């Protein structure tokens, strides 16, 4: 029996030490460092207006008001549901993801055509072939808050009409919320739709400017 306990003593101690280091000390240290150095990012990059969180700079939203810029479609409604959706079965408990339909799938063809029709109605000066692809395709997570600069640009004229703001003002707002390539090399330039709409709302006086 003593031999048995001697045999398991070392692996037991190793397991205990790794549990304390990896399961307790490491997470606590990283959490502490992140809260000190990157507090905003560590807490979800929340966008605060007048003391209230209205969203996250990392999560897209479905903007239906004609005065605001539109983002990419989402197969999971940006993980935003009401109780009626859950009761009716429209909420499947999926927080992120996409339908992963084949290009010829009738459901995908229908959804894309509906999005094209809606976009052309809201942007009558734009031709179908000029609609950037990312405005018609959902991201892999369904939560992407960004669109391409081209997708932002094609919406400017419609926003001029719906908001009363000048074209130059809207282009400046878009420019101020455009993020360059990571390290100047990786990825593409992106525009944060939530931040653009936040600045538009400020210009329209929809809440107090701070």
From Swiss-Prot:
GO annotation, cellular component aspect: plasma membrane
One Pfam family it belongs to: KdpC
Metal-binding is among the record's keywords: no
PANTHER family from the UniProt entry: POTASSIUM-TRANSPORTING ATPASE C CHAIN (PTHR30042), POTASSIUM-TRANSPORTING ATPASE KDPC SUBUNIT (PTHR30042:SF2)
Protein name: Potassium-transporting ATPase KdpC subunit
Main subcellular location of this protein, as a coarse class: membrane
Transmembrane stretches, start-end: 13-33
InterPro entries the UniProt entry points to: KdpC (IPR003820)
Family designation: Belongs to the KdpC family.
Superkingdom classification of source: Bacteria
Keywords: ATP-binding, Cell membrane, Ion transport, Membrane, Nucleotide-binding, Potassium, Potassium transport, Transmembrane, Transmembrane helix, Transport
Role of this protein: Part of the high-affinity ATP-driven potassium transport (or Kdp) system, which catalyzes the hydrolysis of ATP coupled with the electrogenic transport of potassium into the cytoplasm. This subunit acts as a catalytic chaperone that increases the ATP-binding affinity of the ATP-hydrolyzing subunit KdpB by the formation of a transient KdpB/KdpC/ATP ternary complex.
Subcellular location: Cell membrane
Bilayer disposition of the protein: Single-pass membrane protein
GO MF, one annotated term: P-type potassium transmembrane transporter activity
Subunit record text: The system is composed of three essential subunits: KdpA, KdpB and KdpC.
Protein source organism: Clostridium kluyveri (strain ATCC 8527 / DSM 555 / NBRC 12016 / NCIMB 10680 / K1)
